[in-house]
Swiss-Prot record:
Catalysed reactions, as listed in the record: beta-D-ribopyranose = beta-D-ribofuranose
The organism's place on the tree of life at top rank: Bacteria
Organism from which the protein derives: Halalkalibacterium halodurans (strain ATCC BAA-125 / DSM 18197 / FERM 7344 / JCM 9153 / C-125) (Bacillus halodurans)
PANTHER family noted in UniProt: D-RIBOSE PYRANASE (PTHR37831:SF1)
GO biological process assignments: D-ribose catabolic process
Disulfide-linked positions: none
GO cellular component, one term: cytosol
EC numbers on record: 5.4.99.62
Keywords annotated in UniProt: Carbohydrate metabolism, Cytoplasm, Isomerase
Chain's role: Catalyzes the interconversion of beta-pyran and beta-furan forms of D-ribose.
Name the UniProt record assigns to this protein: D-ribose pyranase
Gene3D superfamilies found in the cross-reference section: RbsD-like domain
Subcellular localization: Cytoplasm
Length: 129
C-alpha cells in the first residue's frame, strides 16, 4: 500500500503516465467533460472534496509548469482565483467557452464536488529535471 502522495489509483496512474506538456483538468462538478477524455470522479457530495483540496494534493504530487483557467474566475470566484495565484505557477486565462473547448486535449478530468462558479483549471505537466 502507498504511504505518500495521491492514494486514488486512477489519479496516481494518470500522474505517473504524464509526459512534458501533457495536461489534466481539475474541475467543479458542473464542467462538461468531453466523451473521449477519461473522467475520474472523486465527488462525494456538494462541496466534498473541494476544488482547493484536490488542487493542493495534485500539486504536491505533480510537476506543473503552467495553469490555464477561465478569465471569469478572477471576478466570479475570488477564493479559487487566490488559490490559483497562490501556487506561483504561471497562469494563462481563456474565456470560459474556449476553456471548455481546450479540455478535450487533456488526458483526464478529475471531477471534484466543488459547487462554486469557474472552479476549474488545466494543469500542464512540467519535468523534474
Amino acid at each position: 500500500m502507498k504511504k505518500h502522495g495521491v492514494l486514488n489509483r486512477d489519479i496516481a496512474r494518470i500522474l505517473a503516465s504524464l509526459g512534458h506538456t501533457d495536461q489534466i483538468v481539475i474541475a467543479d462538478c458542473g464542467l462538461p467533460i468531453p466523451e473521449d477524455v477519461e473522467c475520474i470522479d472523486v465527488s462525494l457530495k456538494q462541496g466534498v472534496p473541494s476544488f482547493v483540496e484536490v488542487l493542493a494534493e495534485i500539486l504536491a504530487d505533480m510537476e506543473v509548469e503552467g495553469l490555464i483557467a477561465a478569465e471569469e474566475v478572477k471576478e466570479q470566484n475570488p477564493a479559487v482565483h487566490r488559490a490559483l495565484t497562490g501556487t506561483n505557477i504561471p497562469i494563462h486565462y481563456l474565456p470560459h467557452e474556449q476553456f471548455k473547448d481546450t479540455t478535450c486535449k487533456a488526458k483526464a478530468v478529475i471531477r471534484t464536488g466543488e459547487v462554486t462558479p469557474y472552479a476549474n483549471v488545466i494543469l500542464r505537466s512540467g519535468v523534474i529535471f
